């Protein structure tokens, strides 16, 4: 009976270690994904500024030529 309790306790201990390692790995993967999202937002911010500047310089000329009132 004592050996069975000892082996069950050992299996429980191994199971809890395994679960904690899986949880740490999952948290690391989530942090990795969150970092990619932040990087994408930063790239989008860098991209939107120059595009808006270009659009504001080209749009009035295009409208003027489109309506032929230049």
Swiss-Prot record:
Naturally occurring in which organism (per UniProt): Limnonectes kuhlii
Localisation: Secreted
Keyword field: Amphibian defense peptide, Antibiotic, Antimicrobial, Cleavage on pair of basic residues, Fungicide, Secreted, Signal
Family the entry assigns: Belongs to the frog skin active peptide (FSAP) family. Brevinin subfamily.
Classification via InterPro entries: Frog_antimicrobial_propeptide (IPR004275)
Residues that make up the propeptide removed upon maturation: 23-44
Entry function: Has antimicrobial activity against Gram-positive bacteria S.aureus ATCC 2592 (MIC=5.0 uM), S.aureus ATCC 43300 (MIC=10.0 uM) and B.subtilis (MIC=20.0 uM), against Gram-negative bacteria E.coli ML-35P (MIC=50.0 uM), P.aeruginosa PA01 (MIC=10.0 uM) and P.aeruginosa ATCC 27853 (MIC=5.0 uM) and against fungus C.albicans ATCC 2002 (MIC=10.0 uM).
UniProt keyword Repeat present: no
Annotated GO biological process: antimicrobial humoral immune response mediated by antimicrobial peptide; defense response to fungus; defense response to Gram-negative bacterium; defense response to Gram-positive bacterium; killing of cells of another organism
The protein, known as: Gaegurin-LK1
Transmembrane segment boundaries: none
Disulfide bonds: none
Secretion signal, residue range per the UniProt entry: 1-22
